């Protein structure tokens, strides 16, 4: 594994932070909070507080690996739960919308079906999530917010719905839509920054055309739906430059970007290298790719015998095994996966210290030396 230059920088800059530390795997890290925003990938159980309708993720087999459905779109824990553990937070990240929940070490504001441009009534768009955070902001001190980590994973719903509703969209229309989504994303990040957040972790979009639901609905068989993948790639290409610009114009703005697209693509193309036997269909559901109906009481869903051999648990969401692997990469991997620094390095990077390295195009040869 390559050693990032930012790793050395993180060691040199850690000394001012020697108070309020937690020890994780022998390493001292600041005791800060974790706040997540986005869609169903990060929803810790918020959606059930926005509707009275029965939601499939509240029922078995969701939560199967933990024998406890908690409203998460997985067979068990999700990425933020593992990140919280790595950060020394003694419990899974709680849903912010749950009345009376302990949010002292952060919370999840993410909601299933959320998008950037606008969401249905039983969800919250990204800017609505940020406004909800602002309504609760008195729970945390200003300096605590500034030192905490803010993770964002969103955009899947925007592009999936656009593709379904505009199957024959011309290239110019696709480009215009990507621009509108990313411009709004930038505005929402600015809103969160103006609320006091300064340390951001942004997930790029996965190859959306490779989701089991995309293969099933667009009838691509074993192939991915490349039109959807192209939209994801266009979106991803704009995120890094947006964040670079913000870091260059706001001295206390710090960020890193997780290359979720290529992490998923590698596991799809070379699945046995990562010990996944099945990457093109879901563990739970019905249909050609078992991509519909998981958890619905009126659907006799097929459930795989061993979910840990699957990359996807349901139509759009990864298994707990995959989510844990992603969390390890986010927290401690090299720039081949997350750049310009990982979350461990971001945690110890001094507040108000300008960034010295920025996001680079992952097609750059030097970022392609190691595969994760």
Swiss-Prot record:
EC number(s) reported in the record: 3.1.1.-
Residues at the catalytic site: 40 (nucleophile), 314, 317
GO terms under cellular component: cytosol; extracellular region; plant-type vacuole; vacuole
GO molecular function: hydrolase activity, acting on ester bonds
Record-level GO BP terms: lipid catabolic process
Record's keyword terms, sorted: Glycoprotein, Hydrolase, Lipid degradation, Lipid metabolism, Secreted, Signal
Glycosylation sites noted in the Swiss-Prot or TrEMBL record: 161, 280
Subcellular location: Secreted
Pfam families: Lipase_GDSL
Source domain of life: Eukaryota
Signal peptide: 1-26
Transmembrane segment boundaries: none
The family this protein is said to belong to: Belongs to the 'GDSL' lipolytic enzyme family.
Protein name, UniProt field: GDSL esterase/lipase At1g54020
Organism, scientific name: Arabidopsis thaliana (Mouse-ear cress)
């Amino acid at each position: 594994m390559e050693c990032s230059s930012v790793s050395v920088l993180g060691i040199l800059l850690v000394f001012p932070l020697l108070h309020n530390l937690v020890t994780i795997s022998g390493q001292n890290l600041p005791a800060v909070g974790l706040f997540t925003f986005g869609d169903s990938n990060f929803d810790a159980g918020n959606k059930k507080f926005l509707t009275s309708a029965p939601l499939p993720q509240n029922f078995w087999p969701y939560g199967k690996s933990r024998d406890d459905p908690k409203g998460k779109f997985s067979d068990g824990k999700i990425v933020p739960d593992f990140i919280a553990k790595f950060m020394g937070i003694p419990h899974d990240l709680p849903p912010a919308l749950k009345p009376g929940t302990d949010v002292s070490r952060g919370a999840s504001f993410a909601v299933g079906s959320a998008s950037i441009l606008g969401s249905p009534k039983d969800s919250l768009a990204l800017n609505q999530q940020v406004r909800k955070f602002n309504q609760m902001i008195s729970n945390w001190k200003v300096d605590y917010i500034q030192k905490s980590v803010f993770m964002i994973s969103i955009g899947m719903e925007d592009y999936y719905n656009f593709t379904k509703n505009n199957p024959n969209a011309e290239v110019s229309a696709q480009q215009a839509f990507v621009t509108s989504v990313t411009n709004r994303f930038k505005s929402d990040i600015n809103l969160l920054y103006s609320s006091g957040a300064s340390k951001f972790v942004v997930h790029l979009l996965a190859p959306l055309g490779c989701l089991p639901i995309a293969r099933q609905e667009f009838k691509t068989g074993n192939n991915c739906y490349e039109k959807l993948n192209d939209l994801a790639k266009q979106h991803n290409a704009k995120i890094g430059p947006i964040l670079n610009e913000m870091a260059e114009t706001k001295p206390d703005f710090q960020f890193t970007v997780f290359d979720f697209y290529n992490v998923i693509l590698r596991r799809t193309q070379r699945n046995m290298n990562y010990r996944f036997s099945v990457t093109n269909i879901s563990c739970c559901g019905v249909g050609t790719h078992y991509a519909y109906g998981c958890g619905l009481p009126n659907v006799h869903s097929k459930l795989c015998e061993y979910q840990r051999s699957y990359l996807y648990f349901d139509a759009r969401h990864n298994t707990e095994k995959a989510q844990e692997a992603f969390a390890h990469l986010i927290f401690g991997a090299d720039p081949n996966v997350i750049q310009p620094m990982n979350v461990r390095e971001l945690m110890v990077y001094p507040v108000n210290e300008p960034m010295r390295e920025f996001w680079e195009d992952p097609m750059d040869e030097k970022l392609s030396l190691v595969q994760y």
